[in-house]
Regions:
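Parallel beta-helix/beta-solenoid
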Residues: 153, 157-158, 166, 180, ...
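Predominantly extracellular beta-rich ligand-binding scaffolds that present long acidic/polar faces
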Residues: 360, 366, 383-495
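Beta-sheet-dominated interaction scaffolds and their linkers
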Residues: 534-565, 637
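Right-handed parallel beta-helix/beta-spiral solenoid domain characteristic of secreted/periplasmic
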Residues: 131-145, 151, 156-200, 212-247, ...
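C-terminal accessory segments
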Residues: 477-533
């Protein structure tokens, strides 16, 4: 466990430079120039509220910095209830905090006390869901002719302008420009639009305010990736080569891009299947499409959306930000991100990096991503990550990092991150305390990952307590925490509610305004919780299904959906990507009705599953109003990737792992039908002072050759390598639990602080004979070694 943890931290550490240091896309066809602009930070001279739909930011200036207590109630109703203590910013002499778990379109009263006296009072009204529509514009082939709709219109607070489309009409273009551009418009609604295409971005929202994008279907934007070229080809500039031989950027290619602006809502949208795809950390920092791109907007709400890429066409981040280490970066301030489903990412499910000033991320389901929520670069704060579930983390190769990412030490002086009542299952390294970020980590449930970093908690008075996690040396559950299994109802199928006898039940700490007032469960699931958090009383009996395919056979599996509530009725339809043609779901449509239960059956199509070892997909039970319940599908097959992927000796030289000419380590022969030729060797690390395993090979031509080892998971996934008697360098191997090729970087390759310039290492070799030295850490199972000028085909399948 410790060694695996160290390796994952080594890979995770590569993430820390991604934010401000990552290049913005350049101008030109299919790109958008994001011009840096310092936003005007507000000055608060009195108690100020910035309401959202489900919460409200508050700001209270206090030059003396004396401690305060905050309480609220629904206007004129009941007793005041305490609010979690806000954080104090010494530079701005300002208290900042959030009130959560509020109702929409509801009036609330707040009072602030200090030293037993009320020092301020105020009122606010949360945002409501339905604006008044003054005008509706129906898009069709008659008025959408040029491939781009530019909106500059300005509605009014009591008269919004709504854009929708005629039945069956799909907004399309040739992918050289956006489908919709909203420039400095106000009071605009995009409702029930279907968009397929778009250039680098499908929908641009620039310096606009009071914009709502609701129940839209977006797919297919960006350049089709007929040929994707990664860092090792482009010399530090991830992207692809277009039909004219020009390099194009793939990063920041968004379904919806928010370029500054204020009071923007994105809800109930299905954003899926971009034309391009992101690379894995196997090559360099991931670069590629995202569903939503946030460039310093304020008062943004992203809720109830399904952001679903596909396993071979993954997001970089499902939700990405710019200026990750600027105090106005990313979602900037006063944002709510809740009730979303985000899946299939090469880096993060969501980047909150940047200002994170009263940014609230809660009630979401995060899945199948290298990292879950990134809060590195919390430059202003406070941010709140609470009540979320994390399942089946990992990129397309199964590599995984931190569930909640805190990699960098770049954080604001008085920034605070609250990580409360989240539930985690499956791979990942949990939460690492940070030397420069104060973190309050409480009431979280882990089954394989954990909170670590006890030695650095003291620097910012960080807190970890009332957490449940596995018993490992580095774990920091807290004084009132427990090192035990969480007792999830059915973690294998993603059901993270606690069992009746679970140590999570009624074992949590009461956190004012964030948890029930008594009987608090540790983790995301209190009584009656359904995630992702959505206003529909529909509950699936599982969140994911796991299949095995052998000899082109796999048994169907069923699950049930229960509809609770009273007088609830809505049609639904099974909705999934065209890339998920390898499974069927029945019934494909129907009606959800209160008090009724529906059984669904998922059947695989093994005849379409002969190209990968692992298949991953997802489908939605989606209603016409855009609300849905997601279910993910994972299938292990008996597919074995061909070992020798190049037959051209001028591109690749193969060496049988048993053909070393010398070496002091112990060797065992392994008979395995899935190894090359049915045989592999287990190479053991030599004793101190012992010599490495030495291999001789001949290179037919001068060139740059990447070292690849065909291996499988084993003890300590690292080796030391050298060429022709040079210095031995460490190389981390990203291994699978089956035979697959792993890149073994030349550790002598210089790394810059810019991860976009990192690339898969290589050796520059002259034609003729060479000697390769390999020393495993612990032991390694290896069947083949390759030196190749074209590593792309060696990707695990």
């Amino acid at each position: 466990m410790k060694t695996k943890f160290i390796l994952l931290l080594m890979i995770s550490a590569m993430c820390i430079w991604a934010g401000d240091r990552s290049p913005a896309p350049t101008t030109g066809a299919g790109s958008r120039a994001w011009t840096p602009r310092k936003t005007d930070r507000p000055v608060y001279s009195k108690l100020t509220f910035v309401p959202g739909f489900a919460g409200c930011s508050f700001y209270f200036p206090a030059a003396d910095g004396k401690a305060i207590e905050v309480a609220f109630r629904e206007a004129g109703r009941g007793e005041y209830k305490d609010v979690l203590t806000p954080s104090y910013n010494r530079r701005e002499k300002l208290w900042r905090g959030s009130i959560v778990n509020l109702k929409e379109n509801t009036s609330y009263e707040v009072k602030i006390s200090s030293e037993g006296k009320v020092v301020a009072e105020g009122k606010f009204i949360t945002k409501g869901a339905l604006p008044k529509i003054a005008k509706t514009i129906v898009l069709s082939e008659k008025n959408f002719k040029d491939g781009t709709l530019t909106i500059t219109a300005k509605g009014k607070p009591d008269g919004w302008i709504r854009y929708t489309c005629a039945p069956g009409f799909v907004l399309k273009n040739d992918r050289t420009k956006p489908l919709i551009v909203i420039n400095k418009a106000k009071y605009i609604v995009l409702d029930k639009l279907v968009l397929n295409g778009g250039g680098h971005i499908a929908v641009e929202v620039n310096y606009a305010s009071n914009i709502r994008i609701t129940n839209c279907d977006l797919s297919g934007w960006g350049r089709p990736d007929a040929k994707q070229y990664f860092d090792y080809v482009l010399g530090g500039k991830p992207g692809y080569i277009d039909a004219n031989g020009k390099q194009r950027s793939t990063n920041y290619s968004a379904g919806i891009a928010l370029n500054y602006g204020d009071n923007i809502l994105i809800e109930k949208c299905y954003i899926h299947d971009p034309a391009g795809h992101a690379n894995s950390w196997r090559y360099s920092h991931p670069a590629g499409p995202c569903a939503i791109f946030a460039v310093c907007p304020t008062s943004t709400t992203v809720r109830y959306n399904d952001l679903v890429a596909n396993d071979l066409g993954r997001w970089n981040d499902a939700v990405e930000g710019l200026y990750n280490f600027g105090e106005d970066g990313g979602f900037n301030r006063d944002a709510e991100i809740y009730g979303n489903f985000m899946i299939f990412c090469q880096d993060d499910n969501i980047e909150l990096d940047g200002g994170q000033q009263n940014v609230r991320c809660f009630g979401n389901r995060f899945e199948s991503s290298y990292c879950g929520v990134s809060i590195q670069g919390c430059m202003s704060g406070p941010c709140y990550v609470f009540g979320n579930m994390f399942i089946s983390m990992g990129d397309q190769y199964g590599y995984h990092g931190q569930n909640i990412k805190t990699s960098t030490n770049g954080s604001g002086v008085d920034a605070v991150a609250y990580v409360l009542n989240n539930s985690f299952t499956g791979p990942g390294t949990g939460f690492s305390m940070n030397r420069l970020l104060k973190a309050v980590v409480m009431n979280n449930a882990y089954d394989t990952s954990y909170v670590s970093g006890a030695k650095v908690m003291k620097y910012q008075n960080s807190v970890s307590d009332y957490n449940v996690m596995p018993k490992v040396k580095e774990a920091v559950p807290g004084k009132n925490g427990k090192l035990v299994a969480p007792g999830y109802a059915n973690a294998k199928q993603g059901v993270l509610e606690p069992k009746a006898d679970s140590p999570l039940v009624k074992a949590g700490k009461v956190i004012p305004n964030f948890t029930p007032e008594k009987d608090v469960n540790i983790g995301a699931f209190q009584k009656g919780t359904i995630l992702p958090l959505r206003p529909m009383p529909v509950k699936t009996s599982v969140n994911k299904l796991n299949f095995k395919v052998a000899n082109k056979k796999s048994a169907p599996q069923s699950f049930k959906v229960k509809v609770c509530g009273k007088n609830y009725s809505s049609p639904f339809a099974v909705t999934k990507s065209a890339t998920c043609d390898w499974f069927d779901v029945v019934p494909a449509s129907g009606v959800f009705e209160s008090g009724k239960e529906i059984e669904f059956t998922v059947t695989l199509k093994p005849e379409l599953m002969d190209k990968k070892t692992v298949y991953r997909g997802a489908f939605l039970l989606r209603q016409p109003d855009g609300l849905s319940r997601p279910v993910s599908i994972y299938a292990d097959t008996d597919f074995v990737q061909k070992a020798r992927l190049h037959n051209d000796g001028n591109k690749t030289i193969y060496i049988n792992a048993e053909d070393f000419i010398s070496g002091d380590g112990k060797v065992e022969v392994i008979n395995d039908k899935n190894a090359d030729g049915g045989k592999a060797v287990r190479l053991y690390e030599a004793k101190k002072g012992g010599k490495p395993f030495v291999y001789e090979f001949t290179v037919p031509a001068d060139g740059k050759y990447h070292l690849m080892l065909r291996s499988r998971s084993g003890h300590r996934p690292r080796v030391r390598v050298s060429m022709d008697g040079g210095k031995m360098y460490d190389s981390a191997l990203a291994l699978m639990n089956y035979w697959a090729w792993a890149t073994a970087m030349d550790g002598s390759a210089k790394k810059t602080s810019n991860p976009w310039s990192w690339k898969v290492g290589y050796f520059t070799l002259k034609a003729g004979k060479h000697k390769l030295n390999i020393m495993p850490y612990g032991f390694k199972d290896i069947d083949l070694i390759a030196l190749t000028s074209d590593p792309g085909p060696f990707e695990p399948r």
